[in-house]
Amino acid sequence: EFENEYLGYLSTGQQQRVMIARALISNPELLILDEPASGLDYLARETLLEVLETLSHERPEITIIYVAHFIEEIIPIFDKIFILSKGMNFAQGKIDDVLTNKTMSSLFNRNVEVVNYKNRFSLHMIG
């Protein structure tokens, strides 16, 4: 889609998609994405996540490690989660087992409600 464009002229979201495509050329077994949605607006972030979902279905042999700071970026293709707090392992396991009100409230030291709507998560502070 962007083959005749200079990378510097593309939007941040387009650049992220190009970088993922470049990484896939070598047919990797592992794709590590460190905050790939950082700096993206809502639409670009959702487009990136859709690209990853498509990739997961088309290339199920690829393991994706996705590093994020926001729970909203967790999509159904991810089956496990590892939460760090202050550089230490805070919680890990299956997403439904870890993303609970109790665990997230403990993480933030506040009452938190985890909302799962159509397999997408969000957090709401209570009180």
Q: Which sequence ranges carry the predicted segments?
A:
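Catalytic Walker B motif of ABC-type/P-loop ATPase nucleotide-binding domains
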Residues: 31-34
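Conserved ABC ATPase signature
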Residues: 6-10
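H-loop/switch region of ABC-family ATPase nucleotide-binding domains
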Residues: 68-69
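ABC ATPase nucleotide-binding domains
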Residues: 107-127
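Helical segment within the ABC ATPase nucleotide-binding domain
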Residues: 46-59
